[in-house]
Amino acid sequence: MDSLIAASARALAAGDPLGALKRVALREDPPALALRGIAMAQLGEHLRARELLGRAARGFGSHEVLARARCRVAQAEVALAMRELGGSPHLLTQAVLTLEAHGDRANALHARLIGVRRLLLLGRLDAADQALAPLDARGLPPALAAVAALSEAELALRRLRTGAAEAALDRAQAAAEQARVPALQAEVAEARAALHRPAARCLSAGTAPRMLRLAEVEALLSSPVLVVDACRRGLQLASAEGALWRPLARRPVLFALARALAAAWPGDVDREGLIETVFRSRDPDDTHRARLRVEIGRLRGLLAPLAGIDATARGYALKPSDGRALVLLEPPIVGEQAALLALLADGAAWSTSALALALDASQRTVQRALAELQAQSRVRAIGRARAQRWLAPSLAGFTTILLLPAALPIA
C-alpha cells in the first residue's frame, strides 16, 4: 500500500471524505477507486459511489480475494443507504467468510453489522437479534464499536426495552466520542432524542388525553390493563404469566371494530355508528347489519380471554376480562398510512419495492398508498420508472418507533 492510499484510508476512518478525495481523486487504480467510492458514499453521492466501487471490484485480480471482499462490503453498505433491500445477502455472507479466513476481523464484523441493519429495516427483529447476539465488539476500532452499540440500541428500541436501549446508547456515545466522527455522534444524539419524544397518545375513560414517551408506553404495556394499541394494531394484556398479544394488523375490519369499541369504553357504540365507521356506509341496510354481526362474532372469538363483547340495546360494548381498565393508544400520525410514513421519516429515498418488502405488502398496495399521500403533499417522488424513489419530510416533534413494521409487544 503506497503512502497516499494509506493516508486516504486513515482520513476515511476518521470521517473526513474530502481529505481522502484530495489524495486519490485523480487516480484510476482499483485501490484508489475503492477509496473514492467510499468517500462518495460518505458524502451521500450513492450512485457515483456504487459506480466507483463496481469498477474497483472488477479491477482487482482474481487472486486479490481480500480486496474484492472489502469492495463487496462497501457495495452492500451503499445498497443499504440507497434502500435497495431486495437483493440476496449471499454475496455479503461470502465476503464475511473471506474476511474472517484472512484475519480481517474488523471488516468482517462491519459486514455482519450491515446485515443486521438490513434486517432491522425489514422489521425482521428475531433474525436481527440472532445475528447480533454472537458479535463481540471488544477490541475493535471505536467507530465500529459505536455502530455495533447503535444497532443494539435500535433493536432494543424496536423491542420496547428502553433500559437496554439507554445502556447501548451510553456505549455508543462513548465510542463515538473516542472515534471523533461527527456523523456517528449525530446519529447517537438522534437515537437518544427518540427516547424523549412523544411516541403515542393515551386515551382512557375519565382522564384527559396525554402523550406518552417510549418508557411510559413500556410501563403501560407491563401494567394490568387492557391496551388497544392502534400504533401496532393489536390488543395486549399483561399478566403474571407474561403478555397476551392479539395482532390484528392483517384484519383491518376487526381492528377498526376493536378501536371504535375501545374509544367508547366503558360505554357502547350503536350499530349504525359501527357500520359507518367500519364499512364506510351512511345508509345501512340488513346486509350491513348481518355482516356486522358476523364480524363481531369473529372479533369476540379472537379477543378471548383478553376481553368480551356484550350486545346492548343499541349496539355493542367492549368488556375487559376481570373488570380491568382499558386504554387506547393512538399513533402520533393521523391516517391509515402511518407505517409507510414512519419508514420514509428516516430521510432516505425509498423505492416502491423496498417499501413493499419492509411492510410485507404488495407493490400495488404500496403504490396506491403512495399516490394518496402524494395527492396530500405528504410525500414526493424523484426519478422515473425503475429509478423512481420516494421521500417524505422528517416528522419532527415525536418518534415513530411504534409505527415501524414488526415492532413487537413486550415479551
Protein language model features and the residues they cover:
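Positively charged, aromatic-enriched patches within helix-turn-helix-type DNA-binding elements
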Residues: 257-291
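Residue register of alpha-helical TPR repeats
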Residues: 2, 31, 38, 70, ...
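DNA-binding patch around the recognition helix
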Residues: 285-288, 292-328, 371-391
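Short, amphipathic alpha-helical interaction segments positioned at domain boundaries
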Residues: 325-335, 395-411
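Amphipathic alpha-helical segments of tetratricopeptide repeats
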Residues: 21, 28, 54-60, 93-104, ...
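"A position-specific structural signal for the A-helix of alpha-solenoid helical repeats
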Residues: 6, 35, 67, 74, ...
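Short boundary/linker motifs that mark transitions into or out of structured domains
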Residues: 8, 15, 185, 190-255, ...
